[in-house]
């Protein structure tokens, strides 16, 4: 029996979500361009989701689409849209609408207690992480016992530990766990992110550059402190 020419498989990806609070295309374009210029290696040609939950009706979707793409970003979908007229306008502009799975109320599943004494998996990297490399620790913590070059990317659903110079990007809590943290012995990252809350390099306090630091969320905002 010959193999099918295609195969559909479920998967998951880490995408940046841009929340629009203004419907003026030029204002959006300038704001996005500033972000892209701050971290071109991370954001240039990056796939993004546009969240329109707080955007007023009546936006020109063709112009907004052009504003986002002209800043060097690629729209893969629109989320947060609840208004039917707005949905039709977005569809006419050729933009895909994404469902965030909150529309239907499901009966709660019974809580199952986890088995005791089950060790938490951890992915350990013992070699340097080079520019262009991406390492993803699915459903576990990530430990890197070496340096991370600029242009490299670390992603973990759990915590991230870097025992070396960190010049790349670190995204902890990628599946949305706001309790995750980032620990680094020599912080010089292009970007740090926990559960979608992120700082670009120029937002990291300069006092911590090259220093040992711990990052976590406090009241849904990134915070940093010395790692002793």
From Swiss-Prot:
Q: Which SUPFAM superfamilies match?
A: Cell-division inhibitor MinC, C-terminal domain (SSF63848)
User: Known InterPro entries for this protein?
Assistant: CAP/MinC_C, MinC, MinC_C_sf, MinC_N, Septum_form_inhib_MinC_C
**Transmembrane regions:** none
- Record's keyword annotation contains Cell division: yes
- Origin, by domain of life? Bacteria
How this chain assembles, per its entry, is: Interacts with MinD and FtsZ.
The cross-references to HAMAP family, in alphabetical order and at most eight, read: MinC
Which family does the entry's similarity section mention? Belongs to the MinC family.
Q: What is the protein's known function?
A: Cell division inhibitor that blocks the formation of polar Z ring septums. Rapidly oscillates between the poles of the cell to destabilize FtsZ filaments that have formed before they mature into polar Z rings. Prevents FtsZ polymerization.
What is the protein name stated in its UniProt record? Probable septum site-determining protein MinC
